[in-house]
Amino acid sequence: MKKTAIALLAWFVSSASLAATPWQKITHPVPGAAQSIGSFANGCIIGADTLPVQSDNYQVMRTDQRRYFGHPDLVMFIQRLSHQAQQRGLGTVLIGDMGMPAGGRFNGGHASHQTGLDVDIFLQLPKTRWSQAQLLRPQALDLVSRDGKHVVPSRWSSDIASLIKLAAQDNDVTRIFVNPAIKQQLCLDAGSDRDWLRKVRPWFQHRAHMRVRLRCPADSLECEDQPLPPPGDGCGAELQSWFEPPKPGTTKPEKKTPPPLPPSCQALLDEHVL
């Protein structure tokens, strides 16, 4: 089925133009042993780490939004991936949204990123480090054609494919969300080494960035993991379904009311905000 095209700039909706959520009132990580609680789209985190904004291997975008918090496993993954990318001469890794100090629901742009286990990473690898002005107002590089059926050849590179593959081969990573056209190109380029493609999942938008998701940490007992992706490389009928015309009578699903918070997250809000 053909998926509805959504504007790339939706990922960059300014929080200033949207109503704040209670989670934005928590300005520092909640003290305690690191615990991811609930699901990726309905949860929170205790004991989040702050990603250092200064690094030789990566740069953090939109630091004014203060979305550079996550579980210590996520911080270590970013440091690990960017070091590997630098060792291979790929360029500087550009880090987008992680989570807020206590996780929880954003005021716009994301439904996930709530448990400190998601990170958005730009699919461009500058050889020259970006200025502060560029980092505060990053310009996304749309890799997908206007019709959504393939990548733009002049913008695609083997370095981008290598970055995605490096992330997918990390043992802590369970899913990487990219545009269907990007997944399709990865399938074409992969050759015989294809096991890592299982983790790369086609999804709406994601035309200029990938969203990397880690597994629930073993000691986060209230964290809800997703089932593993289906076996195989995901390059067959499932992927092709994203490029098919919509079925007759297909309508846009109604916007759902957010579910109740996990009790531990509600208790956290009650203590620190309400």
Curated annotation (Swiss-Prot):
Is-annotated flag, keyword Disulfide bond? yes
List the protein's name: Penicillin-insensitive murein endopeptidase
Co-factor binding details? Binds 2 Zn(2+) ions per subunit. Zn(2+) ion 1 is bound in the active site. Zn(2+) ion 2 is bound at the dimer interface by residues from both subunits.
Species of provenance: Salmonella paratyphi A (strain ATCC 9150 / SARB42)
Quaternary structure (record): Dimer.
Q: May I ask which residue range the UniProt record assigns to the signal sequence?
A: 1-19
Single GO cellular component annotation? outer membrane-bounded periplasmic space
**Which family does the similarity line name?**
Belongs to the peptidase M74 family.
Which keywords, in A-to-Z order, does the entry hold? Disulfide bond, Hydrolase, Metal-binding, Metalloprotease, Periplasm, Protease, Signal, Zinc
Subcellular location(s) per record: Periplasm
The GO biological-process annotations, alphabetized, read as:
peptidoglycan metabolic process; proteolysis
The broad enzyme category this protein falls into is hydrolase
Q: What does this protein do?
A: Murein endopeptidase that cleaves the D-alanyl-meso-2,6-diamino-pimelyl amide bond that connects peptidoglycan strands. Likely plays a role in the removal of murein from the sacculus.
Residues recorded as binding Zn(2+) 1, renumbered to this chain, are H110, H113, D120
Gene expressing this chain: mepA
Segments of this protein annotated with the region Disordered: 225-274
Q: Tell me which residues bind Zn(2+) 2.
A: D147, H150
Listed cofactors:
Zn(2+)
Source superkingdom: Bacteria
